[in-house]
């Protein structure tokens, strides 16, 4: 069985990223490459990471006018990512364009509410209601726009799964029971997230900042 854990690679250094991924490759199901990595290493870096044989989750959280996002995704198609993220807040037309131009084997996933945000943060940017309310609303939009799923915290995934049984749900910000929270605000344990309906988990610092990343990955995997 393939592990649902995707390792978050948050470093600009390609050599360090490759070394880390090689250490844990047998205990994770894929690699999530974010803005920091992509801005430093571009297409070349993604190709190098893909040589390890793990699915690539390209987490660029694209958010712009529909035409610009569509052209950006067309430029990314040669990378053949297994998963690609866009911001749900970009609107229906942007989401529809994103899915229309993505490769047939790429899941296009909508980011709903970042796990670093809580209700006061949403109020600061003019959004009323709770993060849960916003996630449910944006999940419905993503589904209607034809996307494959959403990114949400473990606190909302149960409701999202109930409303969208066939959706693909990415849950970041998970922390082992004894793990440090850091800058995350809406967290659950990996086991709870999977029990509530997550499709895959994004795990970064609990593995990458461990003195033994492979052991950390195995310990998290053992709880699932």
From Swiss-Prot:
Keywords: Decarboxylase, Lyase, Pyrimidine biosynthesis. One of its GO terms (biological process) is 'de novo' UMP biosynthetic process. It comes from the Bacteria. Pathway: Pyrimidine metabolism; UMP biosynthesis via de novo pathway; UMP from orotate: step 2/2. It catalyses: orotidine 5'-phosphate + H(+) = UMP + CO2. Its EC number is 4.1.1.23. One of its GO terms (cellular component) is cytosol. It holds the Pfam family OMPdecase. Belongs to the OMP decarboxylase family. Type 1 subfamily. Catalyzes the decarboxylation of orotidine 5'-monophosphate (OMP) to uridine 5'-monophosphate (UMP). Homodimer. This is Orotidine 5'-phosphate decarboxylase. It comes from Sphingopyxis alaskensis (strain DSM 13593 / LMG 18877 / RB2256).
């Amino acid at each position: 069985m393939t592990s649902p854990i995707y390792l978050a690679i948050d470093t600009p250094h390609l050599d360090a990223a490759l070394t880390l991924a090689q250490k844990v490759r047998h205990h994770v199901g894929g690699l999530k490459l974010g803005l920091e990595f992509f801005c430093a290493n571009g297409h070349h870096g993604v190709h190098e990471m893909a040589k390890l044989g793990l699915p690539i989750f390209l987490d660029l959280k694209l958010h712009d006018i529909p035409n610009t996002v569509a052209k950006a995704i067309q430029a990314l198609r040669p990378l053949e990512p297994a998963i690609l993220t866009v911001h749900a807040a970009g609107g229906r037309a942007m989401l529809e364009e994103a899915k229309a131009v993505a490769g047939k084997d790429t899941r296009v996933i909508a980011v709903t509410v970042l796990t670093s945000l809580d209700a006061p943060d949403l109020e600061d940017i003019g959004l009323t209601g709770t993060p849960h309310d916003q996630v449910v609303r944006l999940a419905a939009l993503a589904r209607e726009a034809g996307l494959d799923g959403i990114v949400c915290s473990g606190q909302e995934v149960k409701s999202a799964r109930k409303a969208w049984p066939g959706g693909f749900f990415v849950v970041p910000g998970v922390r082992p029971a004894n793990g440090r929270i850091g800058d995350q605000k809406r967290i659950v344990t990996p086991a709870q997230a999977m029990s509530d309906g997550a499709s895959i988990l994004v795990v970064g610092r609990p593995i990458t900042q461990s003195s033994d990343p492979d052991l950390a990955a195995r310990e998290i995997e053992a709880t699932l």
